[in-house]
């Protein structure tokens, strides 16, 4: 009875529907017996599509519902910002950090930070390009870099592609009802 229709092109309806209910002042509760299965694809191409689509959906929600950012309009504002929107800011913060390091390269502290920054990206590239480097030293930076690249791609798809182009199915098997 609290459900209200959402636009047909909504990319992350599993977030938007409960958020619409919560912003109307209701509590959202989930049945303890309910189950959801979202298996990670072992195929990198499918995982890229899935991540890109989810992050495009976060941008879509941010631009459709800017009022949700304010505590007087959304009692879940901090959860939304910390779990969804800070992830969208990360690539821009990383670009700003690199630019700051390059601008201030004459200072010894910023030279050291630039070396650490560059080393992190080198580890990420090794972890992403060479499957034998799947140990945490390489895979964690690679995963972090991958997520931030998908965030930028998600923004691109949200701004320049139709909703359908960001919503190619990645389902490999139908969900089972228990």
Q: What annotation goes with each model-predicted range?
A:
Residues 82-86:
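Alpha-helical membrane-interface segments at transmembrane helix boundaries
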């Amino acid at each position: 009875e609290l459900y209200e229709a959402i636009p047909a092109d909504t990319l992350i309806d599993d977030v938007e529907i409960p958020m619409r209910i919560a912003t109307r002042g209701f509590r959202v509760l989930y049945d303890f017996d309910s189950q959801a299965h979202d298996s990670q694809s072992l195929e990198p191409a499918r995982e890229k599509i899935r991540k890109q689509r989810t992050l495009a959906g976060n941008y879509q929600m941010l631009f459709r519902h800017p009022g949700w950012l304010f505590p007087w309009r959304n009692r879940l504002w901090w959860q939304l910002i910390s779990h969804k929107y800070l992830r969208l800011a990360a690539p821009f913060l990383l670009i700003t950090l690199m630019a700051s390091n390059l601008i201030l390269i004459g200072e010894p502290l910023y030279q050291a930070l630039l070396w650490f920054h560059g080393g992190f990206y080198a580890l990420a590239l090794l972890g992403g390009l060479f499957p034998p480097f799947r140990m945490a030293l390489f895979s964690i930076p690679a995963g972090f870099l991958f997520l931030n690249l998908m965030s930028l791609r998600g923004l691109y798809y949200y701004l320049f592609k139709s909703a359908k182009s960001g919503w190619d199915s990645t389902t490999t098997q139908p969900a089972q009802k228990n």
